[in-house]
Amino acid sequence: MAPKIFIDGEHGTTGLQIRTRMADRRDVELLSIPEAERRNAAMREDMLNSADIAILCLPDDASKEAVKMVSANNNVRVIDTSTAFRVHPDWAYGFAEMDKDQGGKITSARFVANPGCYPTGAVALIRPLRAAGILPDGYPVTVNAVSGYTGGGKQMIAQMENADHPDAITAPHFLYGLPLTHKHVPEMTTHGLLDRAPIFSPSVGKFAQGMIVQVPLHLDNLAEGATMESIHAALVGHFAGQDVVQVVSLAESRALPRINAVELAGKDTMKLFVFGTPGTSQVNLVALLDNLGKGASGAAVQNMDLMLSA
């Protein structure tokens, strides 16, 4: 019998993407509530408790409510795509390539917190350097990023695509999170193994899908002897043996005139780059991904497949 999957919130941006990815699969059975019954709490609870895996695509508070509905039913495993449980010690963090054993933790977990899009890129760049001892305690990390507007969900999609929207956004590029309290900062801090919160400056561009995350570093404030080459080697070693995260060679990176934010749109992979000029004291680390792919729905399906492989 095929395992039953229920996407709670299947009509939102992330839920729709997950459902589209699974539309042609015959190895799972998708449970669904008719859109007209979305607010039928009894039907929703029944669906949650009938699933082998429930994928929650809900706001934080609604996700917490859904988890309570299945907490006593050990037959139901959960993937949550909100920020509610991403730093919770009892939840596996759903970035399978983060460490060599992370995929195994996801496979055996009952509860998996799907990573945020920005933290996926930031953690991929920062954690290997912390693990290798290159990025010292107390380093003032800065993370700059630009995302496709689909990361803002249905509301922002309407604002960006409908000029008649009462709160239409016409800017081709804009900063937000200006008070430096973005909800992804705790996630970056925890899973980046940082002892102080990074400064995070997010922005949105007038393109639907895609993302660039940047972490600039001063070499003379890193561990003694740190170079562009040693940083690149740390990334290569950390992500060796898998095919989702690609560390682009220094030679290939040097030949690039620009980075295209939408290059990986529609894909579930991620590319990492190390930029700089040999002999100087600065480097810029860059992650390239699809905010709805490896940054959201693609990761959720990957985590589901790992859990089903147990």
UniProtKB/Swiss-Prot annotation:
PROSITE patterns: ARGC. The keyword Cytoplasm applies. The active site is at C117. Its EC number is 1.2.1.38. GO terms for biological process: L-arginine biosynthetic process. Keywords: Amino-acid biosynthesis, Arginine biosynthesis, Cytoplasm, NADP, Oxidoreductase. It is found in: Cytoplasm. Pathway: Amino-acid biosynthesis; L-arginine biosynthesis; N(2)-acetyl-L-ornithine from L-glutamate: step 3/4. It catalyses: N-acetyl-L-glutamate 5-semialdehyde + phosphate + NADP(+) = N-acetyl-L-glutamyl 5-phosphate + NADPH + H(+). The keyword Oxidoreductase applies. It holds the Pfam family Semialdhyde_dh. CDD domains: AGPR_2_C (cd23935), AGPR_2_N (cd17896). One of its GO terms (cellular component) is cytoplasm. Coiled coil: none annotated. One of its GO terms (molecular function) is N-acetyl-gamma-glutamyl-phosphate reductase activity. Catalyzes the NADPH-dependent reduction of N-acetyl-5-glutamyl phosphate to yield N-acetyl-L-glutamate 5-semialdehyde. Belongs to the NAGSA dehydrogenase family. Type 2 subfamily. PANTHER family: N-ACETYL-GAMMA-GLUTAMYL-PHOSPHATE REDUCTASE, CHLOROPLASTIC-RELATED, N-ACETYL-GAMMA-GLUTAMYL-PHOSPHATE REDUCTASE, CHLOROPLASTIC-RELATED-RELATED. This is N-acetyl-gamma-glutamyl-phosphate reductase. It comes from Rhizobium rhizogenes (strain K84 / ATCC BAA-868). The lineage of its organism: Bacteria, Pseudomonadati, Pseudomonadota, Alphaproteobacteria, Hyphomicrobiales.
